[in-house]
Amino acid sequence: MSDIDRSPGFGVYVHWPFCAAKCPYCDFNSHVRHQPVDQQRFVRAFAAEMAHMRARTGPRAVTSIFFGGGTPSLMEPATVGAILESINRNWSVDDRAEITLEANPSSVEAERFRGYRDAGVNRVSLGVQALNDQDLRFLGRLHDVAEARRAIEIARSTFGRLSFDLIYARPGQTPEAWGAELDEAIGLAADHLSLYQLTIEQGTPFFALHQAGKFAVPDPGHAAELYRLTQEVTAARGLPAYEISNHARPGAESRHNLVYWRYGEYVGVGPGAHGRFLEDGARTVTIAERLPEKWCALVEENGHGIVDGEVLSRSQEADEFLLM
């Protein structure tokens, strides 16, 4: 195992907050805009906030970069390239750094993916969520299974590494149905799967529908059975869990996920992004403004969009470390 795989690492998280549509289960910081987003304005804001972060972190060797959202695949490849150039200007990026971009199957085009690859992206994470058209409609996804399979094939032929997400413990889902879907997913996956139980989050459309009795989720016993099945099937097929929801072939674990789980340092740039890094020897937390346009305005005024944060005490650090 190389040093880059052993160390906690230093990560950069970039939040692109825009989506084509808001999924009914999602409580992430994502926003729909019906007019084109001024991507150049955001590129300038990302560059300014990164320069601010560099002044606070000092020199670091970046081992992972993660474009999350939102839907980062709505960014033009040139936008991704410009953001990566800003990261390179502020820190040294390891030659073996993992650079991941989240994408939705509905926004996948071969030429666009080649553009991301040429910009420097070497890993893609697809929001597939289900391999069943009825459940995709229930989840409010804009793609169907055929589009998902096509996106997976394009991603596998374009990037060295691929992951995709599935949501399970969906209403009415049986162990037999989930086992078959999981088996198909493992056959399609290159080396990594992120498998999440459906949770009903307050403030989402699903929360209101669930409260109104419009649908039911599996009871805790049934959900636990689906979780056990998930662990058994993935382990038997060579993709054991390396943390709660992520499964990988040995050596294909997400380095950026491991930054979090190994209590490494990372900076977060963009609307709503969080960071945790050492500043003057103390572990510092930063939290950025969530609303995209307000974040941009703050960066333009102050050089950053950070609105909250703290320096952790030793006891707080110890508590966080134990939770990892």
Task: Name every feature range the model reports, one short phrase each.
Residues 2-11, 29-56, 60-324:
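C-terminal scaffold of the Radical SAM
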Residues 12-16:
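Short active-site neighborhood of thiol/selenol oxidoreductases, capturing the structured segment around
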Residues 17-30:
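Local cysteine-cluster metal-coordination motifs and their immediate loop/turn environment
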